[in-house]
């Protein structure tokens, strides 16, 4: 048994996404063993539910209540039916959705079991009237980047104020310990906050695909190429067992290897 139901962490969980042009949705479904997650019937159910989640608006209760095609059951009842059929517990844990008025929502799956199922699912929304194929290409690369770096926010403006305040307090305390004059300390804090942004804010991070330019500059560069504004509107990152402390791999290196091999 690989599943700790008290913490919702299962080594055999799957995340899955579905995209449809300017919108995309992602789900996480827990099962008890790797055998089930490798089962084609189970994968079909996961894929079907991911497709239905495009119409659920990111609301789990709405998704659970939607009709599951060809069965006369809703999604929640279908999950219960699968439990009875396969003989193992499973749980539709969460869903989320991303949509833009014009542009694309692109997806990337890390540690994929199938192209749209695996261990880390990322959706990225790019808003633009420009060429959709090129937007899709950059969107997928940024999604790879997000899988590797796990940013805290899309932009500085939408960084959690409590997170920023906590970091400022830590940096201020560290700077004061240096014993330097107050005006120097203020400059030190400003510099360190900028460095913090570059670590945790997607638009400020160095793009792992090229290792040189910031993500916001890569997006702006595509806008110039297309002759149309491109705005990075947001991202969703689902990793199995999000919020639970566990051993972390070097995803940046893994993603870089995946890109170079693509």
Model regions and ranges:
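N-terminal assembly/interaction segments in proteins that build large macromolecular machines
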Residues: 1, 6-262
């Amino acid at each position: 048994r690989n599943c700790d139901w008290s913490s919702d962490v299962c080594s055999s969980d799957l995340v899955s996404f579905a995209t449809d042009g300017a919108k995309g949705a992602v789900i996480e479904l827990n099962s008890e063993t790797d055998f089930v997650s490798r089962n084609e019937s189970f994968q079909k159910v996961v894929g079907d539910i991911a497709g239905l989640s495009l119409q659920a608006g990111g609301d789990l209760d709405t998704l659970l209540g939607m009709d599951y095609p060809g069965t006369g059951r809703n999604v929640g009842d279908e999950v219960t039916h699968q439990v009875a059929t396969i003989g193992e517990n499973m749980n539709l844990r969460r869903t989320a959705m991303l949509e833009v008025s014009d542009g694309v929502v692109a997806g990337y799956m890390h540690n994929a079991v199938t192209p749209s199922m695996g261990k880390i699912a990322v959706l990225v929304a790019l808003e633009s009237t420009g060429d959709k194929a090129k937007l899709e290409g950059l969107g997928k690369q940024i999604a790879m980047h997000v899988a590797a770096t796990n940013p805290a926010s899309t932009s500085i403006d939408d960084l959690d104020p409590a997170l920023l305040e906590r970091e400022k307090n830590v940096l201020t305390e560290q700077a004061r310990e240096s014993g330097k004059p107050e005006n120097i300390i203020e400059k030190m804090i400003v510099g360190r906050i900028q460095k913090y942004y570059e670590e945790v804010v997607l638009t400020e991070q160095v793009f792992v695909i090229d290792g040189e330019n910031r993500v916001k500059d890569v997006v702006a560069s595509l806008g110039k190429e297309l002759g149309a504004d491109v705005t990075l509107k947001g991202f969703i990152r689902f990793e199995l067992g999000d919020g639970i402390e566990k051993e972390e791999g070097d995803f940046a290196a893994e993603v870089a290897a995946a890109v170079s091999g693509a």
